[in-house]
Each structure stands twice: as C-alpha cells, then as structure tokens.
C-alpha cells in the first residue's frame, strides 16, 4: 500500500509540474487524474489531500522561481546586480522590466484573492465550473492567436508599460475561476497587448511566482495542522517530482511557445473538456466532487 501511495504521489507531482505553468489548467488535470482516478482523499483524507496539492504546487512555483532567478536578482539588486556599473547598464535600457511592473500586475489578483478566495474555494471548485473555465479559456486563447497574426512588430517583455502590466494582472484575477488557467489567460492578454508569445509568457511566470508563493503560504498556515508525520515522504516525493518536471516543462514551453503559439493548447483543452464531460455525465465519475 505504501508503494502504491508513493507512485500516486509521484504521478500527481508529475502532472502538477507539467501543467501548472502550461496554458492547459492544472486544476482540470488534477480533477481528471486525482479526483476521478487516483483519489488521494481516500488515503490522505480531504484536508491532508488539499494540503498535499498546495505542497506540490510549491514545487512548480520554486521551479519557475529558479528559471527566472536572474530576473528576480536583477529587480531586487541581489548578487552581481549590486554592482553599480551593471545596475547603470540595465537602468539605461528603455522600459526595463522592474519590480513595480510585477507589483502592479499582482494588484488585481491580490485584491480579488483577499475578498473572494473562500467563496471561490467553496463554490467554484466543481467539475461543471472547471469545464466551463477550460472551454472559455480555450476560446480566449484562440482569439488571442488570431489577433497576434495582425501584429507587425510585437513588443518584448522589457517594453511592457505599467498599464499593460495592470491589464495582464486583471486577466490573472479572472483566472481565479478554476479551469480558466492563469497562464492561458495572462499569456493571451499579453498577446492582445501586442507582446510576442515568449515575452507574454515570461511576464506571466515572473508575475505569477510571488502571488502563488503568497497564496500557498497562506494555505499552509491555514492547514498546517493536517500535515501528518506519516505523510511527509508522500509530500516530499510529490514536491520533488513537481519541481524537477516543472523545470523541464517551463524551459521547454518557453523555447517552443513562439513557434507553436496558443491554438494547439486550446484544442487540447477542448479535448480535455470532452473527456471530462464523458466521464462525468456519461459514467457518473466525479459526481461527488464539489467545493
């Protein structure tokens, strides 16, 4: 039984690492893989299973933080960026992405999270609402890709202004609807703001890390009492799997996104909706899942 639990933890960590920062909705995949198949709540209990998902999400967040560590060091003037000549070089570049861009982008989701986090968790984490989010998010991504073909000179991440950062932040707040996908929503909005796909993805990930760290820390503070010593190895293997797979997935995604764009991910999401709908409405699998 212990080996089976470890395998389940490994699978869930891999799924989290693959999907957290891809525009495909990690929530939708967790419903399909965990709630409909592996059912971690059956051997962890509902509260511990929720805490486990927070822990493995942290693995993905740390992976993104590692990939963009140089950007964060630069914005915070840490390490080699303490050097005045290096700082002067970066400051001299027009509209260099800075910490204020990230903070401005975080404002909408931060406010919405404080006001409605409990409501969203209680009422929107159901299979039908996630399917709606998956489908609408896919349509939004297709629209963004269609628009991007008309943009002649897309902007880089260092050309983002504060208004654009705030608008992209609004789309991050909208993506608190489960299934909509934070990265799918914000990358699409960035593309609509005339950024190229890679730059929109860069800003999405850079902006997402601090707010996801804060949200995860808050969840752990609320639920730390449900972390049992016997479950620590299970949490650890899920965390490490999410971190390692997340590193590979993020680097691969950033390398490919300007070539493949968003439509393939949108089509995948629609297929995922169909699969979940067949299992849910056709076979009754996951009927008991709700917020």
From Swiss-Prot:
Q: Where in the cell is it found?
A: Cell membrane
Q: Name one GO molecular function term.
A: undecaprenyl-diphosphatase activity
Where it mainly occurs, coarsely classed, is membrane
Q: How does it sit in the membrane?
A: Multi-pass membrane protein
Instruction: For this UniProt record, give its keywords in alphabetical order, as a comma-separated list.
Output: Antibiotic resistance, Cell membrane, Cell shape, Cell wall biogenesis/degradation, Hydrolase, Membrane, Peptidoglycan synthesis, Transmembrane, Transmembrane helix
Q: What is its EC number?
A: 3.6.1.27
Q: Name one Pfam family in it.
A: BacA
The reply to whether Hydrolase figures as a keyword in the UniProt entry is yes
User: Anything further noted?
Assistant: Bacitracin is thought to be involved in the inhibition of peptidoglycan synthesis by sequestering undecaprenyl diphosphate, thereby reducing the pool of lipid carrier available.
Cited function: Catalyzes the dephosphorylation of undecaprenyl diphosphate (UPP). Confers resistance to bacitracin.
Q: Which family does it belong to?
A: Belongs to the UppP family.
**Name recorded for this polypeptide:** Undecaprenyl-diphosphatase
User: Which organism does this sequence originate in?
Assistant: Staphylococcus haemolyticus (strain JCSC1435)
């Amino acid at each position: 039984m212990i080996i089976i639990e470890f395998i389940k933890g490994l699978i869930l960590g891999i799924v989290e690492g693959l999907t957290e920062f891809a525009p495909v909705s990690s929530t939708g995949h967790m419903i399909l893989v965990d709630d409909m198949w592996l059912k971690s709540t059956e051997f962890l209990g509902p509260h511990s299973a929720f805490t486990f998902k927070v822990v493995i999400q942290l693995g993905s967040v740390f992976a993104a933080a590692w990939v963009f560590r140089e950007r964060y060091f630069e914005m915070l003037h840490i390490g080699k960026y303490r050097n005045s000549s290096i700082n002067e070089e970066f400051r001299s570049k027009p509209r260099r992405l800075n910490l204020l861009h990230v903070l401005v982008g975080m404002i909408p989701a931060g406010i919405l999270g404080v006001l409605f986090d409990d409501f969203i968790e209680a009422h929107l984490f159901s299979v039908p609402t996630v399917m709606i989010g998956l489908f609408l998010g896919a349509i939004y991504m297709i629209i963004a890709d269609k628009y991007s073909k008309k943009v002649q000179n897309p902007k880089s991440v260092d050309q983002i202004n504060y208004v654009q950062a705030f608008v992209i932040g609004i789309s991050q707040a909208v993506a608190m609807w489960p299934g909509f996908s934070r990265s799918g929503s914000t990358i699409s909005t960035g593309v609509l703001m005339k950024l190229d796909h890679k730059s929109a993805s860069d800003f999405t990930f850079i902006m997402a890390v601090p707010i996801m760290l804060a949200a995860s820390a808050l969840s752990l503070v609320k639920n730390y009492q449900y972390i049992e010593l016997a479950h620590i190895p299970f949490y650890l293997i899920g965390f490490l799997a999410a971190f390692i797979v997340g590193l590979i997935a993020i680097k691969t995604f950033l390398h490919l996104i300007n070539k493949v764009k968003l439509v393939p991910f949108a089509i995948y999401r629609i297929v995922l909706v169909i699969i979940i709908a067949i299992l849910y409405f056709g076979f009754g699998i996951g009927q008991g899942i709700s917020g």
